[in-house]
Amino acid sequence: MRQRIESQEQFRALQAEYMAAREAEKRKILVCCGTGCVAGGNLNVYHELKKRMDELGVPCEVSLTEHHDDSVGLKKSGCHGFCEMGPLVRIEPEGWLYTKCQVSDVEEIIQKTILGGQFIERLGYKQGGELYERQEDIPFYKRQTRRVLEHCGHIDAESIEEYLSIGGYGALAKALFEMQPDEIVQVVSDSGLRGRGGAGFPTGKKWAQVAAHTEEPVKYIVCNGDEGDPGAFMDRSCMEGDPHKVIEGMIVAGVATGSTEGYIYVRAEYPMAVHRLTVAIEQAKELGLLGDNILGSGFNFHMHINCGAGAFVCGEGSAMTASIEGNRGMPRTKPPRSVDKGLYGKPTCLNNVETFANVPDIIKKGADWFKSVGTEGSSGTKAFALTGNVVNTGLIEVPMGTTMREVVYEIGGGIKNGKAFKAVQIGGPSGGCLTEAHMDLPMDFDSLKKAGAIIGSGGLVVMDEDTCMVSIAQFFMNFICNESCGKCTPCREGTTRMLDILTRITKGNGRPGDIEELRSLAKMIQNSSLCGLGKTAPNPVLSTLANFEDEYREHIFDKKCRTGSCRSLTTYVIDPAVCKGCTKCARNCPAGAITGELKKPHHIDPEKCIKCGACKAGCPFGAIKEA
């Protein structure tokens, strides 16, 4: 049981104690225990490291509270970000990064690295024929500016002592004892911090609106951890890797706005994030950093976790508060806004995970420090989940204004298998697809809005030349239809109609006028829908129409999909000059559509062919083509 801190002086003393303990660790092994690396078996690597070090008599500590001289710190850290190369293990103080680690590598890591001080080349990262020993030298990391993610991968996410050792909760102490609430709001406003979960509303302005309700004795802070975009995992990694940072940001928001209760809304599909947040909240309560009379200041703040059922629409503010209240997650008409009447009808400050995680550093280091990177209208950094047909997938953080080209080619390592770049889908189902023409566009709120996309929560899906853009539009529209709450007719019926048209087109049944109808429906949905989900639902269709209308026309008029992705528009033929008559294709065909004699060219009956592609995939001579 941790002893409760009753004053600022006790807090500073405890913080200094853990800072000293951290500095005294001569060597550290940081085993990535984010969701991806855990799925890859890194927990087994961690347990084997602990077991073998104990057997070999190597002094090993897993907590700063059990510190002894000349020990090796063994930590279960959060996500390191380089998911493509996981499971990952980092060795300090050298900063060495080992990739694709397995239990079978543990003995060599202990003998050669921990005891021998040598780098194991076969576990190092290689790119372009060059071996990289230090994590910071790897191009994936070198081009980044990690602020929100600074300590993800460097501390034990389930230890409040580790968070205190890096200056954690220092911003809270400063906010409580050295600043007035209006000063906190002003610093956040001056920093230019904008919401990192969607449209980029100024955070300081929102806080000021909640703080202005001085007549209300009850106000709430709500953290939106309902990360629903396909392929996005920024908030999850932040909650898993540095949960105390999010909690501290929320408490500071409570001090600034006069709110005394907070809710973190996390989707139940994030069990590790829920667990680590729960542990962090209990630890903060034990130390007196949450609850009544925090640090003896007289300020009270209580925090709860609410697990959502995974509905995408619950990422919308009013739908989220309805869900927390126990009602069906459905958006409501605005005004009133949540800052006036939100959770339980009270003024509510609602920001997303990354927004709150930026707050502690802004309070400690100041608005000018935060604005030292980024663009004039979009200061600071932004975390992105880089996925798709790119060499290096993972979690990245770059200054606002970084170009797409830098992200895809310098950080991501370019397109897989040497193929040509085609598009990037940014902003999830509410975002849009950008092309080669947009590669040098600064990624900030205003520039992307002009290009017909949004930053959103930060999902980046890279697509190569083999991606069908009509299918991409259909995928996102199908997602929107499934996730629509059904409350308003434009979204419920309009998106269904758009999906019907897109499905027809991909099946080869497109008609003249479909493109015009898609645009007309999109405009109607944007102008008439009740909430942000509906208003932005047509974005993937509109952006693909704007940038790839020729593909739509090929599907509709030529009955052709240039990538071969739309099976209904694909015809398989056998090249008689290449076919050896081995009969493998005929034996593999589930529809019996292929005939021919042994050692003679075969033939595919297009009437029987179900276009599964099994023949082409199995042909050892490459004789089967897509026509």
Which residues fall in each region the model found?
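Ferredoxin-type iron-sulfur electron-transfer modules in oxidoreductases and energy-metabolism complexes
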Residues: 2-27, 43-74, 85-87, 92-125, ...
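Conserved phosphate/anionic-ligand binding catalytic regions in large, soluble enzymes, centered on
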Residues: 33-41, 84, 188-210, 253, ...
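Short amphipathic, charge-patterned alpha-helical segments
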Residues: 249-251, 401-416
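Gly-rich Lys/Arg/Thr-decorated short loops/hinges at beta-loop-alpha junctions or inter-strand turns
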Residues: 32, 155-170, 223-235, 338-343, ...
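Accessory "access/gating" subregions that flank catalytic or transport cores
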Residues: 173-215, 371-372, 377, 385, ...
